[in-house]
Amino acid sequence: MSDVELVKKMLRAVLQSSKHGVAMARLQGDYRALTGEMIPFRKFGHDTLESFLRSIPGVVRLERSITGEVMCFAGVCEETAHIAQLVARQKNVKKTGCSKLLNFQMRARTSHLFSHNVKPRLSLRQPSNMTHPGRGSVTSFYSTQRKLYSNDLPSSRAPAWQMNRKSPVPEKTSVVPSKINTNIKTPLKKTSGTAAQQKPVNRADVELVQGRIKQLLQKYSSGVWLSKIPQLYKSMFQEELHIIQEVEKWTHICTVEKPGSNNIVDRLVYPVLEPVPKASPVPVKSPCKQSPNTALLKQPTLTQKTTRTFRTLAINIPQSTPKPQTPLSPTSPNSTMIDFTLSETPKTQSLSPITPPSTPPAHQPLTTELKQKLRQLLNKYSQGLWAHGLPQLFQEAFGCAFPQYVLEDLSLLADTCMVEYPMPDNRKRAILYTLPCQVQTQPRSRPPPLVLPCTSNPHVPPLIIPTADFHSVFVIEINSTNNVVVRFAGGGYSKSLEVMEEEMQNFYNNIGAGLCLLSPKIGQLVAVASSDGAMLRAQVHQLSEDKVKVYFLDHGFFDLVSRKTLFQLRDQFMTLPFQATTCQLAGLEPFSTDPVVLKTLQSLAVGRSLLAEIVEREDTPLVVLYDTSENDDVNVTAMCLKALQDKSMENPLQVNSVYTNVCVTNVCSDGSVYCQLPSRGQAKLKDIMDKIEAHFISQLTWELLVSRPFCGKVCLAKYKGKWARAEIINLHGSHVLDILFLDLGLPASLEVSELREIPPIFLKELITIPPQAIKCLLEDLNVDRAVWPPEAVLWLRETVHNKAPSCMKIVKLDETRTVHIYLFCGNEAQDIHDSVNRQLASCPFWKQDVYANKINKASELFLPDAGEPSGSSPAPSNALTLPPQLNLPLVGQNMDVFVSVACHPGHFVLQPWQDLYKLVVLMGEMVLFYNKQEVTTVDIQKNNVYAAKIDNNWHRVLVKGLLTNGLVSVYELDYGKYELINYTQLQPLIEEFRQLPFQGISAQLADVKKEVWCEEASMVFRNHVEKKPLVAQIESVEEGEWPWERKISVYLVDTTQENKDIWIHNIMKEFLDEISRDA
């Protein structure tokens, strides 16, 4: 913790825990109680602690007390300049200069840790030049990767060799610059994922390879990824495949197919269909639907080895999985293929514990109807579907049972879907994905195009939808929720438009001044001179004697202009796509022209810069808009649905009124309770929900499966066996989400397959009913605590939650319409002294200082022994085992990484880029598990591993220390962040979540040595690496006693730019040299 940023953060936490300040003489002790270390002020170039504190006035404010003692107070932490002023400037700006106001990005939503859209992705391009001579890249080639990155992550381009390649496997020789002479290049070793150097082959070699390829494809008769063929070829024949680029030309041997999905750049290879005996089934027309039994009709040649190939993952497959399983094809490129060569003798072989027998059980083949239904489900759930959810989905969606034996042997689905095991320790948890050739999308209705078709106009490239899930937009006009005109902000969009419009202004004010357009035609593209001198691209829509109605193609509005302002639009100004585009608002389709919705959108969205979450990427994207200009995110869709509610269905609340027949539906951890009051809305809600129950019982719900979850969506979920209204409030990856039962005030976590759409015939009526759960606070118990003691929460739940009708008296309604009440058991208001409030206040566990007890209980654990060094890390005392150590490449080798935290070049945290999707699945499972658990008291011990709830996600953390106010300092073992949380947010980390290695790797930048990093250098470093995928070349590894103590030294390379490698250590060296010259 020698880093100045971490020290500042911990100092601020210590000082904020005391309103009356901390004496400087006591500050070191309080800091050590939190972090286990002293404040290292000498490392930052200060002789005394007071000198260091005075150098950081933004963190510490020093004052002298009446007695003369120096007191330390928390300094004012000023936030960055708010963008609200900029938003206000944009309110009514339409015509000119808009692009200049859009060159910023809206604050990303803090609730999204990672993208929930998980798509296949290639590994990062490896840099063409290494740092040290003789060291080569041995990074494996992963043909598909589940990408998970933060909202502002740039899209990494494909490797440079893929742009003009004929084969998915590269032919590339990496070179290394010498330290003495950069022009001396040495060829590197080839990696397992790249092709070897080209060597001449004769006709006999080609025929031999073709025969072997034919044998390989007989084994994978349902298809195999082209990028996996060299690996499979080597494992079968113990030879390298040097002419993989020729495979596509061997049409008599195989068929190569490009998948229908734009997200997959690999190709599927199928064997050429040969004539089969007459007794065989009807020939399969589509390779994608080929039966796996077809391969059994083809006898292997004598030269073929009996090889069994199994799908598995490389980490700790448990021994309790000897289930029969055949190869799953097409082989998923992100799965590791482990080959076991068996003897051809008939005697029984003892298989590896991780390897199930290859002979499937004698089950009847799956029917075509069942396979088709499964394909329908997987098309509905394009991001994958957990296999364990199939029985319930089949029963509810199709009214039929799903065979249990298929779940025990998923290889039977080889020709129907792809199977992936993201949790290496659990072979029963599999995700099914539709085959690329089977992807089917249902087209949505599109608004009319903004640009009139005109054959005489030159071609202008179409606007590319941003690849990130979140992007800043400027909302220009909303005619309906299905026709929202917006412009994208940032690089490649508003910035490029600004540059082009400046070039247009310079051109038409000089060379192009005489290019006036005397006879415009409808549909013609023109340049229009605005009143302030700007030149804008437009299209002619209507003509009159002296006026022309034009549509401004980059700014999305119509206007009448004089003929004298029209100019010919030159070709050099048609290379940039037109920036105004249309989108549709998700969740508001049934209310597309509702006056209430349009009025709400006018006030919340039109003329403002918002953050757009892209739910569906098409020519007209489906988006959710957020206003992130304030501290709290405002979901525009949710606000529009709220505006549709009929307020007359609410029970009017009045101070000093008594309400009977109250039902307490939820008790939160902060002591707030949700109550249902009798109202007209509650009676109508019960009537509609009864009809919905009958609808689901009488009809199949195939069309009502929720396939596109997003925050703010109102749908249905089951609570205690009955359907209830729910709003999606958070997403954890693509399979797990958080909801809020609107009429219960009860949050829950579940899988997306458990949600259902509201039947259309009930939708509009149901949306108008306000939420029936009212949030209330118990008067006299509003203590200064973010979280109540677990004992108090449990007592309150046992006393009033879902018990006999209660009674409440409202004593106050604050500005936020929060209701302060006295709650009574029974249906009559009694004396206040008999209220639940007073009963709880008199309980022993409420009166005692819970935080002090926690500290006293664990204080002995925080004090080091007499001879123990202050920096040592005692052994964790958890009885459960720790995960295995994360496997790293050898020194000098490369690995694809994602930088989750970057303090400065001396300390940052890496995550393995290829395994991020496993972490997302793990965290989703943790959300499902812990959010369903009751609040329990945990014996918190320093240097132990726990599960912690941080920002609505569950993390694996290491406890570093406790503060006297009940806050706990924890270190996120997968992300490398330090956080302060309430002690009640900690739970034991069960064995199931200890299988995946901790993903956070502490690192420092190689070849850059400096003891103390200035803030300017740290900011430069963060801007280049934080929240970005990079290639790391390992320079050294410093092992530790525990996984979180390991630290590596790496070179970082940014390969996201086209044909350019950016070495981060060179940037930092140049920056340090520049600072030295200035000094």
From Swiss-Prot:
Gene Ontology CC: P granule; ribonucleoprotein granule
Induction trigger: Down-regulated by miR-430 in somatic cells. Down-regulation is relieved by dnd that acts by protecting the 3'-UTR of tdrd7 from miR-430-mediated RNA deadenylation.
SUPFAM superfamilies membership: Tudor/PWWP/MBT (SSF63748)
Main subcellular localisation: cytoplasm
Record Pfam families: OST-HTH, TUDOR
Domain of life: Eukaryota
Chain segments carrying region Disordered: 153-175
Keyword Repeat: yes
Annotated Tudor domain residues: 519-576, 708-765
A GO biological process held by the record: piRNA processing
Record keywords, A-Z: Cytoplasm, Differentiation, Repeat, RNA-binding, Spermatogenesis
Residues annotated as domain HTH OST-type: 3-76, 205-270, 366-434
GO molecular function: mRNA binding
UniProt keyword Cytoplasm, yes or no: yes
PROSITE patterns: HTH_OST, TUDOR
Subcellular location: Cytoplasm
Purpose: Component of specific cytoplasmic RNA granules involved in post-transcriptional regulation of specific genes: probably acts by binding to specific mRNAs and regulating their translation. Probably required during spermatogenesis. Required for structural integrity of granules in primordial germ cells (PGCs).
Family: Belongs to the TDRD7 family.
Record protein name field: Tudor domain-containing protein 7A
The organism's taxonomic lineage, starting at the top: Eukaryota, Metazoa, Chordata, Craniata, Vertebrata
Designated gene of the protein: tdrd7a
